[in-house]
């Protein structure tokens, strides 16, 4: 199936999804097949050029994704790099992940979508995406197509050989970017090992490696990040994965930044969101924003499931 012969169809999908209307099951099947073609040729360390806008977790908050495009600029006018966690917890995971995948098919050089720890079969069965697919499609087929596609998402990206981007964090199994490049990523997120760590680990103020309270991945100290950046010629690690109240947060010695792009997370956390714009000269600036106003969902907070945050 060739992407070039399907441009008109992909444009129709984008138009429909931009109205927060889910695609038919048949369209989802076709879209996932096309996306596999595009993603399968990308590297585990996908090379990205400036200018680009870097984004963190979205978690099915579709209207806030629309606000992100409103603030950062529409695709494909702005180049985007999303660092995972498109699904679960929000009410519109199907529409959110579908739109980002459709953009990826239509503008493969303009948008990069990485894998987060929620782009997994096991996690989505617990935190909402599986149930949402059942509710919207009446069966689990669409969930199956999406989660099969998630196996193809790149694990990390490298902006101008200087800024390393990934969902979670570092791994004691990985010293160099070449160690990431040789991983076989086309699989369910494992319970342990380097792929798991890249999607689950968190920076910490304490030096060295630590046991993660999440039960997967590790915590890594400023010394670990400093050594990794030095060994790989990097200026900075940009990652997502953690709720930060102002939308972005630096580690103490400014070598790791966390970016979180789901404002008022779970429709009740009251946090700001942020995106990081990087210009042609690799200067970066953060844009913070609040949740998008939406009249039709004012009742939403009263029926938010009591997820563990």
Swiss-Prot record:
Keyword tRNA processing belongs to the record: no
Catalysis performed (reactions): O-phospho-L-seryl-[protein] + H2O = L-seryl-[protein] + phosphate; O-phospho-L-threonyl-[protein] + H2O = L-threonyl-[protein] + phosphate
SUPFAM superfamilies xref list: Metallo-dependent phosphatases
A Pfam cross-reference name: Metallophos
Functional note: Essential role in cell cycle control. PP2A may be involved in controlling the entry into mitosis, possibly acting as an inhibitor.
UniProt keyword terms in alphabetical order: Cell cycle, Cell division, Hydrolase, Manganese, Metal-binding, Methylation, Mitosis, Protein phosphatase
Protein name per Swiss-Prot or TrEMBL: Minor serine/threonine-protein phosphatase PP2A-1 catalytic subunit
Active site: 118 (proton donor)
EC number from the UniProt entry: 3.1.3.16
Alphabetized PROSITE patterns for the sequence: SER_THR_PHOSPHATASE
Organism expressing this protein natively: Schizosaccharomyces pombe (strain 972 / ATCC 24843)
Gene3D superfamilies given in the database record: 3.60.21.10
Family under the similarity heading: Belongs to the PPP phosphatase family. PP-2A subfamily.
TM stretches of this protein: none
GO MF annotation terms: metal ion binding; phosphoprotein phosphatase activity; protein serine/threonine phosphatase activity
Ligand binding (Mn(2+) 1): 57, 59, 85
Binding residues for Mn(2+) 2: 85, 117, 167, 241
Cellular component GO terms, alphabetical: cytosol; nucleus
